[in-house]
């Protein structure tokens, strides 16, 4: 995904496998992989962290070709899906951390703009997730940029 508020492209990502077939070197069955996903989720890992752990420690590049389900679908079947989508939660955490920084460092005007951009992204994502029904329609993020100025 490209960066939202700049003219540069987002280049930081791992290269996905060229084919979407299940690799021949995987010895685990789909049921065993689903159990690993459930176990890691109960340990408190997010879906992206689960995917990274499976890739790095178990040599499983993609879950979907093997299990015919995504990590999110596996978690949803087992009632382990988070209430708030992972990307929205991460951006809200980032905004809260930046708010804390700006309260301690009043002269940091540059990061006021960064907070504005982060909050704009929160609002855009929240509109999308409300529209598809992933978060409640009453969910609201309170902006603090207006209070800082």
Swiss-Prot record:
Pfam families: Ribosomal_S13_N, Ribosomal_S15. One of its GO terms (cellular component) is cytosolic small ribosomal subunit. Residues 1-20 are annotated as: Disordered. Residues 1-14 have a biased composition (Basic residues). The keyword Ribonucleoprotein applies. One of its GO terms (molecular function) is small ribosomal subunit rRNA binding. Keywords: Ribonucleoprotein, Ribosomal protein. InterPro entries: Ribosomal_uS15, Ribosomal_uS15_arc_euk, Ribosomal_uS15_N, uS15_NS1_RNA-bd_sf. It comes from the Archaea. One of its GO terms (biological process) is translation. Part of the 30S ribosomal subunit. PANTHER family: RIBOSOMAL PROTEIN S15P/S13E, SMALL RIBOSOMAL SUBUNIT PROTEIN US15. Belongs to the universal ribosomal protein uS15 family. This is Small ribosomal subunit protein uS15. The gene is rps15.
